[in-house]
């Protein structure tokens, strides 16, 4: 990661890149994108908790574009970036399947529940008070105040019964729970 970063953020992006993004005058920023959320296989589908904490401890994996991600720009850095340049974050979550436009793999209920909980944990990390588990992790990572996270994208261009079942489970999750 660069040393000379925008707002001197630890693990932040280069100033010139952030200035270009800022000058676009966008209103929101989608992260981590689409296909990266789904992964090539269920093992490479993105998990929120693999994108926070010390960069050298974050697992890397192959992407469908034939290179590896370091997860160097993780969820926390993304939320800070949005805060720094006044963008509304739109977090993309896995909806219980790999890419439907390649060889789709629909997760069984137990694994789908793990990804549902992962999404709930990410939302808690971003928005909950510090006396919750994930709010406390955010505080330990240097940001005691909740981030402004209003938008969640469920899946990436997904469709069908499996998608609708996950969407229904996600939208009916009224209570954010703190399971790691």
Q: Positions of the model-derived regions?
A:
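Non-catalytic accessory regions flanking glycosidase/transglycosidase catalytic cores in CAZymes
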Residues: 1-180
